[in-house]
């Protein structure tokens, strides 16, 4: 092996969901929204001055940060915006998980967590779920270098009640606790209210699922101003202009159209509940989904044996 080859950082990469080029398929593999984004996005596109594209975008994403903060009743300095929640989470791992102690996250969860930990050389321990696929809060009461978990979890779609989320935070006030809420709009109560109660909490959300804008790559998180400043310092050390002008403009329109947002989320929740009822009638079993997908199995799967080659 050549010397330069020995110095290559090698990781097992995350495998993104397939994005087929054909249009005549029912695509379910990445939990995208079946409804288009608010029509106000098209209006924003028509208003856009193409000459503006010759200029760099606002590095601080000021207008979008303000729109998000106003919508959720937070201060601007409590909001960080990134290129999708994956970018936000990655920045969080790099910024806050620098201890020799392992970070903790569920063993059945978002598979990107272990990829980031390996990439940034962060030690970690995966905590098992219980027999019903629930996160066990007590497993996170031990010494660690940080905690991250989705709520609702993926791929189980199970929501953990806010009092249990707070129990985990109470037992980990010396480290940063990240609550990944990519699917929170489809069920359950956000941990956002805990941001003003605990200085070590970050709540991460995304435009990709409930706001129908996976193609725009907009993610954000809430935290105390000191955490948000640290995230911005790290972001600006990578690239000052991460969010493009189009995403900023479309994101603002999406946040401001509350009526359309709630209408689409309501349709998806209704469809999910109908699907759960029909799947039960067909003999499927599944945890009680609070996301926009269902983690289902069927007893007949246990009876099938693949033929010998």
Where are these regions (language model features)?
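Short hydrophobic/aromatic beta-strand micro-patches
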Residues: 222, 295-297
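Short Gly/Ser/Thr- and Asp/Glu-enriched loop/turn motifs at secondary-structure junctions
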Residues: 287-293
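PLP-dependent aminotransferase class I/II
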Residues: 60, 200-280, 284-287
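Conserved small/polar residues in nucleotide/adenosyl-binding loops
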Residues: 304-309
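Hydrophobic residues in beta-strands of the RecA-like P-loop NTPase core, especially within AAA+ ATPase
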Residues: 179-180
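Helix N-cap motif at beta-to-alpha junctions
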Residues: 299-301
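Conserved core of the PLP fold type I
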Residues: 53-172, 183-198, 202
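N-terminal "arm"/small-domain region of PLP-dependent enzymes with the aminotransferase-like
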Residues: 1-55, 143
């Amino acid at each position: 092996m050549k010397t330069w080859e020995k110095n290559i950082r090698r990781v097992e990469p995350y495998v993104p969901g397939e994005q087929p080029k054909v249009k005549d398929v029912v695509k379910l593999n990445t939990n995208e929204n079946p409804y288009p984004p608010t029509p106000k996005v098209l209006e924003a596109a028509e208003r856009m001055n193409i000459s503006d594209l010759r200029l760099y975008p606002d590095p601080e994403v000021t207008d979008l940060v303000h729109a998000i903060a106003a919508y959720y009743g937070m201060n601007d300095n409590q909001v960080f915006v990134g290129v999708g929640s994956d970018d936000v989470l990655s920045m969080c791992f790099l910024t806050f998980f620098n201890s020799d102690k392992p970070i903790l996250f569920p063993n059945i969860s978002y598979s990107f967590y272990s990829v980031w930990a390996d990439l940034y050389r962060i030690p970690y321990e995966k905590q098992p779920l219980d027999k019903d696929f629930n996160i066990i809060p007590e497993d996170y009461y031990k010494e660690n270098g940080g905690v991250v978990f989705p709520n609702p979890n993926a791929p189980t779609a199970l929501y953990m009640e806010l009092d249990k989320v707070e129990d985990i935070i109470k037992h980990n006030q010396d480290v940063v606790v990240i609550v990944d809420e990519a699917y929170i709009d489809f069920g359950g109560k956000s941990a956002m209210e805990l941001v003003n109660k605990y200085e070590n909490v970050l709540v991460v959300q995304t435009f990709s699922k409930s706001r129908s804008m996976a193609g725009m790559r907009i993610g954000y998180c809430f935290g105390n101003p000191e955490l948000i400043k640290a995230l911005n310092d790290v972001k600006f050390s990578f690239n000052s202009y991460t969010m493009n002008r189009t995403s900023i403009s479309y994101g603002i329109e999406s946040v401001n159209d509350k009526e359309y947002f709630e209408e689409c989320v309501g349709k998806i929740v209704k469809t999910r509940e109908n699907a759960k009822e029909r799947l039960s009638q067909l003999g499927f079993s599944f945890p009680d989904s609070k996301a926009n997908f269902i983690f289902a199995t069927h007893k007949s799967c246990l009876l099938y044996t693949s033929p010998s080659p």
